[in-house]
Amino acid sequence: MKKPAYIGRFAPTPSGYLHFGSLVAALASYLDARAVGGQWLLRMEDLDPPREVAGAQVAILETLERYGFEWDGEMVRQSERHDAYADILQRWFNHGLAYACTCSRKQLEAFEGVYPGFCRDAGHAAENAAIRIRVPELEYRFEDRVQGTFHMHLGRESGDFVIRRRDGLYAYQLAVVIDDAWQGVTDIVRGADLLDSTPRHLYLQELLGLPQPRYLHVPLITQPDGHKLGKSYRSPPLPADQATPLLLRALRALGQPVDAHMADGTAQEVLAWGIRHWNASLIPRQRTIEEARIA
């Protein structure tokens, strides 16, 4: 069987319920895949049990179904993929590409997110320590389909970053690269808050000899104070009975044409309309959009 030319995915985190910002990201990834006859996969990024909200996974699936989304194949849970992460991490550790770090947050807070390398050559044991990957003094760049050229010098702007936390939980940066490759994802459509993570992903892809996916980062939906919508700021979950109007609003947030007659349609009809008329070049070329400004 021939592999699809386009494999996309939506990968929510069950630290809360889906909100309008989640819907915009899900819709963009869904329409971008379906408009070219591609696959759309669903992955639950449940890497952090202490932050997971009870019942959120079930609620996320139910919401996606009520809003008309249909995914291909079985949903993947990252909590069931730990062996794959451990194998690669151990390989890098054995070859000196990764190392143990015992630095506390307090020690690092003055460095504004750029790791200064305190533990780089300390030779700490891996137990009760975070694991960091060594980064080169190189700039990584990519062409985003909406945001344009993006680049980051990993040494100066990131430093060696964590791939496994001190508590033993695997970091998003590691898991997302491994799982996207394992699932054959060719196109990653997600929020612009993850632009800064992408150069790190390019580096890990390089280490693993993986092909680079195409990237499209959609504007992040924010509150008036500039914070993104999310559980931390008590963003309301998507109501079960508002699928059609909220899907239409999400289309407008993505700059897509909306037919007035669609207001009387079902969620499935709105999605079908969106697929037929999808044009990624109409997505606003900006990092954020304030929710209150969306009609």
UniProtKB/Swiss-Prot annotation:
Cystines in this chain: none
Top-level taxonomic group: Bacteria
Cofactor note: Binds 1 zinc ion per subunit.
Binding locations of Zn(2+): C101, C103, Y115, C119
Record-linked InterPro entries: Glu-Q_tRNA(Asp)_Synthase (IPR022380), Glu/Gln-tRNA-synth (IPR000924), Glu/Gln-tRNA-synth_Ib_cat-dom (IPR020058), GluQ/Sye (IPR049940), Rossmann-like_a/b/a_fold (IPR014729)
Listed EC numbers: 6.1.1.-
Keywords, ordered alphabetically: Aminoacyl-tRNA synthetase, ATP-binding, Ligase, Metal-binding, Nucleotide-binding, Zinc
Top-level EC class: ligase
Binding locations of ATP: K231
One of the record's GO molecular function terms: ATP binding
Motif mapping: 'KMSKS' region: 228-232
UniProt short sequence motif 'HIGH' region, positions renumbered to this chain: 12-22
Cofactor field: Zn(2+)
Binding site residues for L-glutamate: R9, F10, A11, P12, T13, E45, Y172, R190
One GO location term (cellular component): cytosol
BP GO annotations: glutamyl-tRNA aminoacylation; tRNA modification
Family: Belongs to the class-I aminoacyl-tRNA synthetase family. GluQ subfamily.
Functional note: Catalyzes the tRNA-independent activation of glutamate in presence of ATP and the subsequent transfer of glutamate onto a tRNA(Asp). Glutamate is transferred on the 2-amino-5-(4,5-dihydroxy-2-cyclopenten-1-yl) moiety of the queuosine in the wobble position of the QUC anticodon.
Protein name: Glutamyl-Q tRNA(Asp) synthetase
Organism: Pseudomonas syringae pv. tomato (strain ATCC BAA-871 / DC3000)
